[in-house]
Curated annotation (Swiss-Prot):
Its cofactor is Mg(2+). The keyword Magnesium applies. This is Phosphoenolpyruvate carboxylase. It comes from Salmonella paratyphi A (strain AKU_12601). The active site is at H138, K546.
Length: 883
């Protein structure tokens, strides 16, 4: 195997060996032997040995109920260890620096070599960099927080073992620690006992900030500064921090009745409390380090006689006292106590920034730049990135909730039923009320619980410290009145500033109408005055793909963005496109660099705002070094997209995409919506029903408890198909459409699109990634074990379709095998398959036993149920995504 991966393979093998020793110590030699036999059979089966494949199936089918859980846990834990080794490999000196900060240097050199770009243009593009990452809880990190922490510790051990100068006794110590951590993981229950609450999810987000981003962001800025100095002779200004973090945890109430106004209020306080806690740690360090005496007259004037002997320390101690007073007040508020605000309560970033920056300027002026640019600079940058709120919150709610609230208000006032009015009448009413000086809400009126909740949420926004709430996102937005309605409700709550309100267009029809909706809004004078030249629009990836299939959805997303960019440019509006991508391909996920460069020209000029979801947060920001790599990749992609924009697609390419879109959507919906066998097949061939039992996120899996595929959220829909390895939502319809266009004699045109148009080549690359993870024999095995014989023909049809799709994509890409241009990912999938395959076979067996017990009216066997949950978590680790 490729030399490049030998370090990764040896780490994986070493971790596997330690896990084996742990299993032997815990359960005895016979269980370890059983696990080893299964592993060897799986490896041989993967290499094409049919006899061993049959033996693998028989061995797993014959496991007793007592053996199920240990075997499932062994393979699941191994995959977590393999993922940890892989994450370390991506940042280790021996790894393929697939995500190394070097990427910025490469991009800057590439830009400097462009004849029509000069240093001043590149510098201007750097100064306008803006990257906002929005952390969301779903599709939900399936791995428990306690295990994530242990994985981080294991990563540190691998780092120490990589040091060639390590002494033997130190190596023994590190190995002992590694054994302890793997044993701790083995003896920890990997499945949560209950669903996390929205507050638990928010705390998980804060833990990511504390354990990784807090150190990762300043490190990234140092790296960026170094590369800019080296390549452009340009230093980043101290107050320039192009990256910020926002969270949906505790703010996203779309379809989640557990996120209430009170929860949002609580999470806002908790977030501020965590910020004071982290800044206090920074200030403790600065109090200890800034013992210098020399200071500028300005600083001495600031500290007065009292602080003249140690001016920096004096200022830091005063700031520490303010932070402590703020923290105490926040603690009391979190306990429900109403206390008067203390003098000096920290509510704005400037209050933190000013004393720190005064110290920085004085140190620089007194020739102590080396000290100024140490811990102090890192803290200043954290103030700019995180500040008093730590992370800002987005509020998200579905459009119909606002319509229903206004309907209830208008009916009470006796002026008609807002819900039944035409769009023109709704707009006329909303604009009249927005311009009116009198309040709309009647006094002493008792609204329904749902309406009260909507109004209370608006009140929380109005009362929150300015800057702690980033935007109000309206899901399932369809009309201009959906946006105006939110502005009116916020006005009624007494909001004193222009809150960005972002419509989220997420079905195929809504994406196609997005430009019309925004054009109508921008033609309203009142609205133009309110937004002051800035507009945010969110593009939904997951629901549009679930609605129409990935090919039609991705083309609709591209066209919607393209039209919005042109409309806003013409109107002189600065547009920020907010990308609601998922981690998986079926929900719009793609390697960051490729995905950004495949967007329409101009789409990143207003900066990048993108959701980072669930388990992807750990893969991309789980460690400070990985954070540096991920932020560097985003930075280089934004610079490249803005300075070397992709070409406008030729008209003939657009026509082909229109054709592909129509055929793929018809094919996709023909199966998913119109084939009467499809829903029963889906329910039996995947663990969709069992997934509902997994205590994953705080959000219910369905928008409506009854109903078919359309009522399922995009996440369980993808998750279920990922589990049985058919990966259906991520490819269905795409290959059929490509095949039809090839048959029409346009293969050479498709090849040109693949070569010269990043949008199209990224689509094909994403299909290849999905095909690499899909597995025909496993999908077939699920059918044989779980599906009624009458439905077998449908399963066979879908698998045949998948096989044909793979051939057509390889033909267009001119490749002999999948992932030819990304060997690192192919290697990674190959490495994990040996461990994922037994989990898939075992899962099918467990689903069979579990359903049989249910059919017989017996109570479920807890050993089977627990082992099933472990296989679901294990396959998710093997596939590197949940939904």
């Amino acid at each position: 195997m490729n030399e490049q991966y030998s370090a990764l393979r040896s780490n994986v093998s070493m971790l596997g060996k330690v896990l084996g020793e742990t299993i032997k110590d815990a359960l005895g030699e016979h269980i370890l032997d059983r696990v080893e036999t299964i592993r060897k059979l799986s490896k041989s089966s993967r290499a094409g040995n049919e006899a061993n494949r049959r033996e693998l199936l028989t061995t797993l089918q014959n496991l007793s109920n007592d053996e199920l859980l240990p075997v499932a846990r062994a393979f699941s834990q191994f995959l977590n260890l393999a993922n940890t080794a892989e994450q370390y490999h991506s940042i280790s000196p021996k790894g393929e620096a697939a995500s190394n900060p070097e990427v910025i240097a490469r991009t800057l050199r590439k830009l400097k070599n462009q004849p029509d770009l000069n240093d001043a243009t590149i510098k201007k593009a750097v100064e306008s960099l803006s990257l906002e990452l929005v952390l969301t809880a779903h599709p939900t990190e399936i791995t428990r927080r306690t295990l994530i922490h242990k994985m981080g510790e294991i990563n540190n051990c691998l780092k120490q073992l990589d040091n060639t100068d390590i002494a033997d006794y130190e190596r023994h110590q590190v190995m002992r620690r590694l054994r302890q951590l793997i044993a701790q993981s083995w003896h920890t229950d990997e499945i949560r006992k209950q669903r996390p609450s929205p507050v638990d999810e928010a705390k998980w987000g804060f833990a990511v900030v504390e354990n990784s981003l807090w150190q990762g962001v300043p490190n990234y800025l140092r790296e960026l500064n170094e590369q800019l100095e080296e390549n452009l002779g340009y230093k980043l200004p101290v107050d320039f921090v192009p990256v910020r973090f926002t969270s949906w945890m505790g703010g996203d109430r779309d379809g989640n009745p557990n996120v209430t106004a009170d929860i949002t209020r609580h999470v806002l306080l908790l977030s501020r409390w965590k910020a004071t806690d982290l800044f206090l740690k920074d200030i403790h360090v600065l109090v200890s380090e800034l013992s210098m005496v020399d200071a500028t007259p300005e600083l001495l004037a600031l500290v007065g006689e009292e602080g003249a002997s140690e001016p920096y320390r004096y200022l830091m101690k005063k700031l520490r006292a303010r932070l402590m007073a703020t923290q105490s007040w926040l603690e009391a508020r979190l306990k429900g106590e109403e206390l008067p605000k203390p003098a000096g309560l920290l509510t704005q970033n400037e209050q933190l920034w000013e004393p720190l920056y005064a110290c920085y300027q004085s140190l620089q002026a007194c020739g102590m730049g080396i000290i100024a640019n140490g811990e102090l600079l890192d803290t200043l940058r954290r103030v700019k990135c995180f500040g008093v709120p730590l992370v800002r919150i987005d509020i998200r709610q579905e459009s119909t909730r606002h319509t229903e609230a206004l309907g209830e208000i208008t009916r009470y006032l006796g002026i008609g039923d807002y819900e039944s009015w035409s769009e023109a009448d709704k707009q006329a009413f909303l604009i009249r009320e927005l311009n009116s000086k009198r309040p709309l809400l009647p006094r002493n009126w008792e609204p329904s619980n749902d309406t009260r909740e909507v109004l209370e949420t608006c009140k929380v926004i109005a009362e929150a410290p300015k800057g702690s709430i980033a935007a109000y996102v309206i899901s399932m937005a369809k009309t201009p009145s959906d946006v105006l309605a939110v502005h009116l409700l916020l006005k009624e709550a007494g909001i004193g500033f222009a809150m960005p309100v972002a419509p989220l267009f997420e079905t195929l029809d809504d994406l196609n109408n997005a430009d019309d909706v925004m054009t109508q809004l921008l033609n309203i004078d009142w609205y133009r005055g309110l937004i002051q030249g800035k507009q945010m629009v969110m593009i939904g990836y997951s629901d549009s793909a679930k609605d129409a299939g990935v090919m039609a959805a991705s083309w609709a997303q591209y066209q919607a963005q393209d039209a919005l960019i042109k409309t806003c440019e013409k109107a002189g509006i600065e547009l920020t496109l907010f990308h609601g991508r998922g981690g998986s391909i079926g929900r719009g996920g793609a390697p960051a660099h490729a995905a950004l460069l495949s967007q329409p020209p101009g789409s990143l000029e207003g900066g990048l705002r993108v959701t980072e979801q669930g388990e992807m947060i750990r893969f991309k920001y789980g460690l400070p070094e990985v954070t540096v790599s991920s932020l560097s990749l985003y930075t280089s992609a934004i610079l490249e997209a803005n300075l070397l924009p992709p070409p406008e697609p030729k008209d003939s390419w657009r026509h082909i995409m229109d054709e592909l879109s129509v055929i793929s959507c018809e094919t996709y919906r023909g199966y998913v919506r119109e084939n009467k066998d499809f829903v029963p097949y889906f329910r039996s061939a995947t663990p969709e029903q069992e997934l509902g039992k997994l205590p994953l996120g705080s959000r219910p899996a369905k928008r409506r408890p009854t109903g078919g595929v359309e009522s399922l959220r995009a996440i369980p829909w993808i998750f279920a198909w990922t589990q049985n390895r058919l990966m259906l939502p991520a490819w269905l319809g795409a290959g059929t459409a490509l095949q039809k266009v090839v048959e029409d004699g346009k293969q050479s045109e498709l090849e040109a699109m693949c070569r010269d148009w990043p949008f199209f080549s990224t689509r094909l690359g994403m299909l290849e990634m999905v095909f690499s993870k899909a597995d025909l024999w496993l999908a077939d095995y699920y059918d044989q074990r779980l599906v009624a014989k009458t439905l077998w023909p449908l399963g066979k049809e879908l698998r045949d379709l998948l096989e044909e799709d793979i051939k057509v994509v390889l033909a267009i890409a001119n490749d002999s095998h999948l992932m030819a241009d990304l060997p690192w990912i192919a290697e990674s999938i190959q490495l994990r398959n040996v461990y994922t395959d037994p989990l898939n076979v075992l899962q099918a067996e467990l689903l069979y036993r579990s359903r049989l017990t249910e059919e017989q009216g017996k109570s479920p066997d807890p050993r089977v149920e627990q082992a099933l949950m472990v296989t679901i978590a294990g396959v998710a680790a093997g596939m590197r995504n949940t939904g």
